């Protein structure tokens, strides 16, 4: 194919009117071969550094433009296989074909544009026009013309006159070409060219006065200030409360009944979405349609099953940068990070108490509202937490799934088993800061601390006796009432306290969990072991005032005292 020495070159008809010219064009070097238009001709690539400098709105704009360009090519009937870039963008991922190094500009081509009736919409024409500037503007845009595959030079001249307005767009000051030293970029405004250069040099001239953070463009600094200064842009129309994030406003709206039209008939709780109400109802019905194929455990919500499955794989892809701890779920890592920051962003409006997590605040609020949405089907007792209901159910079933490997004893709760194991391990992780005494159970430490303060806030109305712990007062009241609620299933004997029943049961089972490390002798009570140890140490702490005798236990000491008083033992 040849072109006339003067005038516009002739272009062979192309499929759908699209293609590249094979002719030499004045002002442009080299002879170019004809080829079909590809997605690469209308795609814009970013380096990793450039992509990271874009804010979210700019990245979203890029995604939309690239997807539109691809759809337009398909609309025009051009056979284009789906590029990896488009697949990534459709899935919401980062672009897959980011440049890892500086790109060298390819030799230009003369891009033949299309007749007006071949453009499906104006936006496509504008997009192609910008791409021409980006790819070929370096070589001068005065030679780029919109052409149709015309049969003669005269027909081409007539056609050309219809595109004067569009050709003028290529020569306006708004479309000046700015050459970046590292990347061949065409930017349509001088300010954009400056921004691009700042991103490549790493300069960040815009600094936040509050925290010292630097940004490469002013818009990034503005966005940062919104977060840093906690400016409340989003206002609740119902109560007037303002928030700095739209998501926080959405969560807040739930507290207003007028925006929660979906109400639970069982407990009266209201929700702003019917789907949320449906999920909530499963609490009352105990419906659990989602079953784990590995262990058979069932769940009421599919997302919880998905999270549960990770237990079987053992995968923990989310690691804490502070302590290195790994987590199977990203949200768990986010919650964990609050431990290091000490942040407690969730505050109770009733009492002012603050919490690390929103779920803890939700549970806490039930103390004030008295809400108990979790009801036992056996006895009708209600609870404010699902975990408490789960533990309660074991009372009816009698199930004891947690077994001690040392002695074979079984327990209803895992926490009770953990405490029990400390008998053998001698572990005492809870230490008193005042006296250094250590305990195996946290509640025992809490009770012990009151010794140092001397406080006895719990008083008996019958006799006036005061106690440090509420549970001790409850047990004391049984002295007056004669109540013995703890009954032995073996012999029928009843006791005031559960601890006494536990000790009594060892008579029937023969269990002796307290073992002497010196001689190996075992005892069914810790107090008996303590007394026994004095045999090995020779300690005799009990001494009468009237003589030099000493005793290693209180019973012998008491008998000796009665001898002094003339009493017969």
Curated annotation (Swiss-Prot):
GO terms for cellular component: nucleus. SMART domains: KRAB, ZnF_C2H2. Residues 536-549 have a biased composition (Basic and acidic residues). Keywords: DNA-binding, Metal-binding, Nucleus, Repeat, Transcription, Transcription regulation, Zinc, Zinc-finger. InterPro entries: C2H2-ZF_domain, KRAB, KRAB_dom_sf, Znf_C2H2_sf, Znf_C2H2_type. Its main location: nucleus. Residues 66-108 form the KRAB domain. Residues 1-31, 536-569 are annotated as: Disordered. One of its GO terms (biological process) is regulation of DNA-templated transcription. A zinc finger (C2H2-type) spans 206-228, 234-256, 262-284, 290-312, 318-340, 346-368, 374-396, 402-423, 430-452, 458-480, 486-508, 514-536, 542-564. The keyword Nucleus applies. It comes from the Eukaryota. Residues 1-12 have a biased composition (Pro residues). It is found in: Nucleus. Belongs to the krueppel C2H2-type zinc-finger protein family. May be involved in transcriptional regulation. This is Zinc finger protein 273. It comes from Homo sapiens. The lineage of its organism: Eukaryota, Metazoa, Chordata, Craniata, Vertebrata.
